[in-house]
Every structure is written in C-alpha cells, then in structure tokens.
Amino acid sequence: MSLPLGIERCKVDTNGRFKLPVALKKGLATEDSRFVIRRSINAPCLELWTHAGFEQEVEFLNQELNRYNREDVKMLRKLMRCNVVELDTNDRILIPAEQKECLKSSKEIVLQSLGKFIEIWDYDTYTEIDNDATDYAEKVDQRLGSLRREAGSSDRSDT
C-alpha cells in the first residue's frame, strides 16, 4: 500500500480551492479522484483521506462501535461528519464551506502527511504548533524508545 509522504505549503484561491501537490498525489497511488475531508478530532485542522482509505476507516468504526450505545453513536456522528470532494481537471480540491472555517481565513495552508491521511492546516496555526517548546526527542524516546527496547531492535547505544 502506497502512502503519501511529505509536507507541502499551498495557496488557497478565492473560491477555496487548493492544488494537490504532485508529490503527495503520487504517494496516494489511486486513480479515484474522490476524497473525503473531515475535521480532525486531535487538532485544529482537517483530514484528507482517499475515498478507499476512508471506506476502510468506516469499516473499522462499524466493527468497533456499538450502534445501540448512545456514546458510541455520538462518537460515530462526530467521526462521520465529512464531505466527499473530487479533484477537478487541474488537480484542485474545493474545501467545503462548513469545513473552511476550521482553516480561519488563511490564503495559505500546509499539507502534512500522517501516513493514512493528510492533515490540512491553516499556515499560521501550523507554524504555532510546529514551534512549540516541548522536547520532541525526549517525548519520542519515552513513547517509542521503550517499544524498540522491548522488541530488541534498538539502534541506540546507551552511554
């Protein structure tokens, strides 16, 4: 399965469209021009999924959530609040009006690949979160270092 990799800055035109960069489009490895956009539950951004990738996500949600449990149904409603969009002939995607407000009034966005999907950030918001003062290396070591050591595949030598 091909995955999009990378980070790209894009301009948003006056109609709310942006051009999907060639590098990210190639990484999506799909002939289908349909995509799904939804608000992220983890950050103030949008998520761009391939249509097939989102179908897999829905299948997973349907297996894991109980439609007769009120809390699960509320969660499902939030996760399914999305729009299907299509690439136009110029490889542009129109950001739906109800989701455009998540991007403030920015004329510039950042597309950040997260493997299964691409985050769509307002440029200013992305710059703020990307420059936060947390110790990134320490957090990675705490979260992933112990997993590598448990698996016996640590490349690091403790000195």
Which residue stretches match the model-derived regions?
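Short, charged/polar, Gly/Pro-enriched secondary-structure boundary elements
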Residues: 55-57, 126-130
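A positional/architectural concept
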Residues: 2-43
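Short, structured motif recognition centered on aromatic/hydrophobic residues
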Residues: 16-20, 91-95, 118-120
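Short, solvent-exposed interaction modules
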Residues: 56, 62-100
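Acidic/histidine-enriched, glycine/proline-rich intrinsically disordered or flexible terminal extensions
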Residues: 134-159
